[in-house]
Amino acid sequence: DVARKLGHTEDAAFFADRAGKLRRAYGPTFLNPATGVLAGWRSTDGQLHDYWFTFVNGVAITYGLVDDKDARPILDQLLAKMTAVGYTNFELGIPGNLVPVRKGDYIFHDNPPEVFGVPRLEDGSDGFQYYENGGATACYAYFMVKALYQVGRKADARRLFEPMLRSFATGDFQGFCDNGMSKDWRDWHGGCHGYEGFLVDSFLPLLAVFDEWETRR
């Protein structure tokens, strides 16, 4: 789009061609038929690594790598999985993944599981809900909310988004808790497990205010 608007026609054609190829390859490469959602990555051995990533699927849908007709069943699966695993407290944000990341998919194993979610058990369960191993956060939660608005699922989008707005209003995505860890990453019971204190990515969901506004015009 930028190249086209600047009159760089050759660049625009190049990028459009590559975008088309990426779009055609993305679904067949990453959609996991066993779960009905997009995996996080495919390793060199061909194996899909799928931990029910909410942000991966949200980003892909938001940026048009998945058609709306294919996006709706993906979102249905993610919402159903959230219910199945018992995640309901959207005032804490949205977990980046809904099942534990296995130990074998981590590179470093130096910290206790409850610090950064790095597991010691092979199935990853001891690190689950901590930091980027299923911790609840507003970081990149925007894309799940945006994807729901984009395909016309207003009620579902609001169910996730409105509790987060209440937390933004009270400053609950910034600062530190009594344990010295910050509020930008929490376990599902609200315990703090972040370290930055003010994670700017956590404020992306506020962009969805414009999507909500569009639904009311």
Regions found by a protein language model. Name each.
Residues 1-9, 13-20, 27, 31-32, ...:
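Active-site core of glycosidic bond-cleaving carbohydrate-active enzymes
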